[in-house]
Structures are given as C-alpha cells and as structure tokens.
C-alpha cells in the first residue's frame, strides 16, 4: 500500500483522482467526453477523458506555455480545444506555415467541420499563435485496412475462450494504434492475436504493414478472426 501511495504522486503511474491532482498543478483539467444524464434510470455517469490521454496533455503542459510556436505547443492546445480531439500533430510544410492535423474520437477519426473550427479558434488565440505563423487546421487522412486471420489452437483449451481473449487483445492493440503517425504492423497484429492457447496465426490481411505519416491515422474497417483447428 505504501508503494502504491508513492506511485500515486508520480505522473507516470498516477491514475484517477491522483492523476487529476497532478494535472491541476499544471492547470490542466480532465475533459468530459460525454456529460452525465441524471434523468435516465439508472442515471448515466459522465464519460471522462482516459488517464493515458490526460497524462499526455500534462506532459505537454510546459510546451503550451511557449509563445514561440514549437510543435508541442500546437499539439497541446489542439488536444485541449475540444473533447472530440483524439490526437493532433503539427508540421511546417513551408517557413512561417504550420499545418495542424486533427484526428477525431468519433467514427473513423475523420473530423467534422465544427471540430476543425473549434481547434482553429483555439490556435488562433493571440496568446497561442505567434504573429508570424500562418496556421492551417486540416483533417487527418484516414488509411483504412482490414484484419483477416485464422487461429490454430493447442489441444485442450476452450476455443471460444481463447478466441474471445485473442479478439480482446486485438481490440486493445488497434485502439492503441489509433493515433497520428502510428503504424499498424503485421508483427503487432500477430503479437496481439497470440493469446494463451494459440499455437499459430495465419494472417491474410493486412497483407503488409499499414504505414502512415504524421498527418495520417490507420483505421480498421472490418475484422474477421476464426479458429480453423488445433495443432501440437
């Protein structure tokens, strides 16, 4: 318990209310993704920003204090501009020009016009944007792919349990890969599907690594994972 309490004051390990307290020290508040609805039965609690997303914004907080226009400052202010912003990146295609790409939490990640407008307004603030910068807020390019895999299991384990675990691990990997500039690799999919009890994975799709730029994000449009038999 003492060790857990000690970790609770460290940004890398803090979670929940402990992380909220650390964030408050940096003048950063956890975003509300969906407000609570007390009129439902039972009442619907608010959906809050995940710990990992809040932790990242806290790590960027000092970048946000700069008025010189560093990459981290634009990313920090873009991430805090609206609860639907899942990720953002900043590049400079030409001197004095900044392109901020925005990835949405909603759907495939392609942001709607109102979300882009909210980010643009936040970055246009005179305390954020240097006078010499022309800031263009653009939608992230979504690179679609599918996952098609067949699993061979070791004899003994319940195939339904193993398949469910493999799918859960794949879901977690795809969620962590849903970021700008984050490749989805075949080795990553293999590793995710190799749950306890899986002897082999035959991966048909993606046929190659899904490689994306800082302005792109990979999105899985469909997935099919089947058990085809058992092996030694």
Model-derived regions, located:
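N-terminal polar alpha-helical/low-complexity "assembly arms" that mediate subunit docking
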Residues: 1-67, 161-232
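Carbohydrate-recognition loop of C-type lectin domains
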Residues: 63-182, 231
